[in-house]
């Protein structure tokens, strides 16, 4: 009997780990999307999802999104996650973004920035959205 309960419990745990994780839903703020003739028109190769951390001690996610919208000719990514789990879209996923070197840019259909913060609660919300967005992006573009 004990063996049967153990096997049942292990089967249940295994099944739970194989299910998709969608307990946290993020929303995308499109306020800072690049305009029609802004950003690269070159389609990126589906090799990597590029993950960055801003390393900016004082900027909010919103500030970073505004900066990238203004500076798109030199640096921008598809998304910036910050301000308690808000996902700001700047560039168009699937196209080259200018968040890394030329090889990484050409081979990353999605680049995501994470707001730097020392606040634990903000970090936890940001990180949940960051990981979920990275996972969803990898699935969308067939990246293991």
Residue ranges and their predicted role:
Residues 107-144:
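Long, well-ordered alpha-helical scaffolding segments within enzyme catalytic domains
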Residues 2-106:
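N-terminal catalytic cores of peptidoglycan-degrading enzymes
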């Amino acid at each position: 009997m004990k063996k049967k309960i153990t096997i049942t419990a292990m089967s249940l745990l295994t099944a739970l780990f194989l299910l998709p994780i969608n307990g946290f839903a993020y929303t995308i703020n499109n306020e800072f999307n690049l305009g029609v003739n802004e950003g690269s028109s070159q389609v990126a190769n589906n090799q990597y999802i590029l993950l960055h951390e801003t390393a900016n001690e004082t900027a909010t996610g919103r500030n970073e999104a505004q900066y990238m919208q203004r500076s798109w000719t030199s640096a921008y990514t598809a998304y910036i996650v910050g301000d308690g789990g808000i996902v700001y879209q700047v560039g168009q996923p699937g196209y080259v973004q200018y968040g890394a070197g030329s090889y990484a840019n050409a081979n990353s259909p999605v680049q995501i920035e994470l707001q730097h913060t020392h606040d634990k609660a903000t970090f936890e919300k940001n990180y949940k959205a960051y990981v979920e967005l990275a996972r969803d992006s990898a699935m969308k573009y067939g990246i293991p």
